Amino acid sequence: MAEEKWVVMVTAQTPTNIAVIKYWGKRDEVRILPINDSISVTLDPDHLCTLTTVAVSPSFDRDRMWLNGKEISLSGSRYQNCLREIRSRADDVEDKEKGIKIAKKDWEKLHLHIASHNNFPTAAGLASSAAGFACLVFALAKLMNVNEDPSQLSAIARQGSGSACRSLFGGFVKWNMGNKEDGSDSVAVQLVDDKHWDDLVIIIAVVSSRQKETSSTSGMRESVETSLLLQHRAKEVVPVRILQMEEAIKNRDFTSFTKLTCSDSNQFHAVCMDTSPPIFYMNDTSHRIISLVEKWNRSAGTPEIAYTFDAGPNAVMIARNRKVAVELLQGLLYCFPPKPDTDMKSYVLGDTSIVKEAGLEGELPQGIKDKIGSQDQKGEVSYFICSRPGRGPVVLQDQTQALLHPQTGLPK
């Protein structure tokens, strides 16, 4: 390491995920070990993702991190756990183009710069910490030449944010709670890839992009301490639902999938209500969206849309296919129209081709009106995001997408 001015960087993109069988409650707060298994769908990173650039240089005097342009402290135990675990697995790195060699032993004394950016609101119930920690671990593993598979890396990401372990894969992912005290068997595994059930379309109603009043971490702790329903859920309900959900996903059985997804979301929020003091993540708009979907499915005579809510008011709706998704978007925009000064481009994000197909000029077709009922459900929706099941994390080769300057390792 004779030349002291060099900077080596890696930029990665990692998706977020939405749980269809929920994780709520830890049996070990430090290692972040859950009280039950969970299953999630990974969202297309083109629509919802974290971008992270990690850099190493002998000129850096300490580890530093910038999140969405603001420097944040890395002193928290979750960041420290992830950094320690990755550093302990680092290997020799050689950049022949730049003539740089980093020996395995050098990683202990070299410092890192990390810049991370979410393309969606942080801490508003859209699993930003999941994508964030998954991206951090994935990018650092690439930078340090860590030779471990995604499941092994998921055990490290889990120590930053529980649901982060599920963002290291695309498609549908299961987080095994594991039984060992050290957490070595509490890892994520891919059930199916993103092509297995690619008919599905996901529409998210961002009801509020403000930070929530009760964080997931404190909410879970209070539920574990006070909710009898949570104990029953973890022991009796979830193990059965996990098996049923795996079967539904394998067989692309949308009827079973919808029943399980909606029931599990509702039970999770019932647990929050059963917590002392009760936790309210959903609001009136969330409840109106549930009513809309329930009425829609009854009117259709068969489940066409599943809904699920994480620890926040945002509704995640999963449509059986694109035709249903187009009709659903029409209905949602009829019920929750944008404010007069908001244009459609900033009101419907993600896969905007659905907006074109929805043909939003003119009157709503009567068939859709029948499915959603009267237009008395106006509520505060900030915007919608259209997405689909997506792939896992990738390294971005295009250096123009890096968040750090290649010469200085400081934010651009």
From Swiss-Prot:
Keyword field: ATP-binding, Lipid biosynthesis, Lipid metabolism, Lyase, Nucleotide-binding, Peroxisome, Steroid biosynthesis, Steroid metabolism, Sterol biosynthesis, Sterol metabolism
Primary location group: other
Subcellular location: Peroxisome
Gene3D superfamilies in UniProt: 3.30.230.10, GHMP kinase, C-terminal domain
Pathway participation: Isoprenoid biosynthesis; isopentenyl diphosphate biosynthesis via mevalonate pathway; isopentenyl diphosphate from (R)-mevalonate: step 3/3
Keyword Lipid biosynthesis listed: yes
Class in the EC hierarchy, top level: lyase
Record-level Gene Ontology MF annotations: ATP binding; diphosphomevalonate decarboxylase activity; identical protein binding
Binding site for (R)-5-diphosphomevalonate: Y23, W24, G25, K26, R78, S161, G162, S163, A164, C165, R166, T217
A GO term from the CC aspect: peroxisome
EC number: 4.1.1.33
Chain positions of motif Peroxisomal targeting signal PTS2: 40-48
Lineage: superkingdom: Eukaryota
Biological process according to GO: isopentenyl diphosphate biosynthetic process, mevalonate pathway; sterol biosynthetic process
Reaction(s) catalysed by this chain's protein: (R)-5-diphosphomevalonate + ATP = isopentenyl diphosphate + ADP + phosphate + CO2
Function: Performs the first committed step in the biosynthesis of isoprene-containing compounds such as sterols and terpenoids. Is specific for (R)-5-diphosphomevalonate (MVAPP). The catalytic efficiency with (R)-5-phosphomevalonate (MVAP) as substrate is 10000-fold lower than for MVAPP. Can complement a yeast mutant defective in MVD activity.
The family this protein is said to belong to: Belongs to the diphosphomevalonate decarboxylase family.
Protein's UniProt name: Diphosphomevalonate decarboxylase MVD1, peroxisomal
